[in-house]
Swiss-Prot record:
Entry keyword annotation includes Acyltransferase: no
Pfam families linked: Sod_Fe_C, Sod_Fe_N
Free-text comment on the cofactor: Binds 1 Mn(2+) ion per subunit.
Family per record: Belongs to the iron/manganese superoxide dismutase family.
Quaternary context: Homodimer.
Keyword Metal-binding appears in the UniProt entry: yes
InterPro entries referenced in this protein's UniProt entry, alphabetically: Mn/Fe_SOD (IPR001189), Mn/Fe_SOD_BS (IPR019833), Mn/Fe_SOD_C (IPR019832), Mn/Fe_SOD_N (IPR019831), Mn/Fe_SOD_N_sf (IPR036324), SOD_C_sf (IPR036314)
Cofactor requirements of the protein: Mn(2+)
Species this chain originates from: Geobacillus stearothermophilus (Bacillus stearothermophilus)
Name by which UniProt lists this protein: Superoxide dismutase [Mn]
UniProt keyword annotations, A-Z: Manganese, Metal-binding, Oxidoreductase, Phosphoprotein
Highest taxon, organism lineage: Bacteria
GO molecular function terms attached to this record: metal ion binding; superoxide dismutase activity
Modified sites of kind Phosphothreonine: 34, 70
Length: 204
């Protein structure tokens, strides 16, 4: 079964004014769609790999034939990263997490504000294209960043919150003002989804 572009759980203009409609449309229908198309093309001659999940492919890249390893890394990573990204955004987002996730953030980082500052620094400090992440690693929360479309899954970590800092994610609205885009991101974070992913990651 080929991989498919997931539908967005909200309209393209739902995240306005924080993330604009045109960016969301191009980002989803063009950029993400291209990763899916190229991933399927890379796997086309390898029926033994076509039934594997994205997580199975990305968590063991070394097991893949060398001829398709880079294509799966880049396009499979792009598909995984964006599939998560769309779900952790919401027009009803923002605010702060509650419950178990809030407790874990306070315990690890001292406060929600301190966590936001550290995550924002990871996003702003990622040179060139890449992502900032909140991951679960051995049951613990951790902030990390990855280059290009690399996924924390490749390092055995479980991403629960991600921010795309490729220029295609923000340039139409924010041009080179990445810190403004990062600040706007906090207004649309779907903390219920992040909390769900945290619970699932801890149960692994």
């Amino acid at each position: 079964m080929p991989f498919e572009l997931p539908a967005l759980p909200y309209p393209y203009d739902a995240l306005e004014p924080h993330i604009d409609k045109e960016t969301m449309n191009i980002h989803h229908t063009k950029h993400h769609n291209t990763y899916v198309t190229n991933l399927n093309a890379a796997l086309e001659g390898h029926p033994d790999l076509q039934n594997k999940s994205l997580e199975e492919l990305l968590s063991n890249l070394e097991a893949l034939p060398e001829s398709i390893r880079t294509a799966v890394r880049n396009n499979g990573g792009g598909h995984a990263n964006h599939s998560l990204f769309w779900t952790i955004l919401s027009p009803n987002g923002g605010g702060e997490p509650t419950g178990e996730l809030a407790d874990a953030i306070n315990k690890k980082f001292g406060s929600f504000t301190a966590f936001k500052d550290e995550f924002s620094k990871a996003a702003a400090g990622r040179f060139g294209s890449g992502w900032a992440w909140l991951v679960v690693n051995n049951g613990e929360l951790e902030i990390t960043s990855t280059p290009n479309q690399d996924s924390p899954i490749m390092e055995g970590k479980t991403p629960i919150l991600g921010l795309d800092v490729w220029e295609h994610a923000y340039y139409l609205k924010y041009q080179n003002r990445r810190p403004e885009y990062i600040a706007a991101f906090w207004n649309v974070v779907n903390w219920d989804e992040v909390a769900k992913r945290y619970s699932e990651a801890k149960a692994k």
